[in-house]
Amino acid sequence: MKHLLISIVGMLSIYTSNAQQVIDVHCHNIFPEFTEFLERHGAAMKETFPLPQWDIDTHLEFMENAGIGKAILSMSAPQPYYGNTDECTRIVRFYNEASARLKSDYPGKVLFCASLPLPDVEAAIKEAVYALDT
């Protein structure tokens, strides 16, 4: 009985340690197309706060080395509204669809927070519905 109890406790501790994982909840995926968009608007902040180059392979390697099991990606600042709602909506849709492809390509490793084309509330509602339905 004593050995059974020790075995059960040992198995539970292994299960518990395997069930836990580190989740990076503050992670920005910066697609080259987003950086180009910001550059067109003079908003890339190259001299003061340049956005890093980002790619999924390098990020997955970083996650592995850091012991991160899952990343929740989100769009970086600055937000992409520069007076043109249609343009903002297009880049946000691009970001959401590209992020959804990453989620699909790397199941269990990558999730993302959909972005919304603010400050246009109507466009934001449409994008939220689209993001939730796809």
Task: Give the label of every model feature segment.
Residues 10, 18-134:
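Helix-coil boundary/capping segments in enzymes
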Residues 4-13:
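Sec-dependent N-terminal signal peptides
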